[in-house]
Amino acid sequence: LPSKAVEYRLAREVETISSWLDDIGESGSVLDVGCGAGAWVEIFANRFQSVVGVERSPQMVAAAQERVAHLPNARVYQGDGRQDLPEGPFDFIFLGGLMMYLGDADVVELLQALKSRLSEGGVIILRESTVRKGVLALKGEYQVIYRSVNVYRQLCEQAGITEVEPRGNSGYASMAIAEEFVRIRRKWLSFLPKESLLLGSLTWAVLRAAAPVSFWALPQILNRLHIPWPKLQNHFFRLRPSS
């Protein structure tokens, strides 16, 4: 898929949580745990007073530091998101897809550690890939745990966080649908090149042009027929720890 697809996804994601970000206020201090290449650090630095990103991968840290080098209120350093957290306090802590790599006990422990680093009235926002029911644990080369919204609620409750507000991530869903169509094209039109920027761009352009059907109506119809498609979902969760 073309870079425009990633830009579209990210723009839709920001739109999804925009009201939550507005509630924090421009003077807010932000911690991004597992910040990757710094896309969200850059977004937050353009909205808030100060942003700190922590990332384990040295390659990702270098990419993130380069990305936010022009922003004096943003800082990224290398560290383990579970062991090398700054003390804070922070008005807003963001985790963009870290929990799915942790077991349940580690999720609860990390949430408790993050909760202790919030300012009064501060919030935690998670962005996690999800399944519709229960848990799907993948083993092998790529080990990950996909949890349902209800399972995340239960883990938050174990960490002492009872106010949990989920929001579906339509930007992620659009990308997942596009990737499914690419897989279908490769399977049924195998005579075409599997890796083709032109074909990827054409696929994305057609899906975007038919967005009311491809990104909304089709998944709704299939879900009503009890056909879970796309298989994975993604949700944002706003967590408000009680005082």
Show which residues each predicted segment covers.
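Conserved beta-strand/loop positions that form the S-adenosyl-L-methionine
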Residues: 33
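Short acidic/histidine-rich motifs immediately flanking catalytic phosphotransfer sites
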Residues: 89
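Short catalytic micro-motifs in class I SAM-dependent methyltransferases
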Residues: 97-101
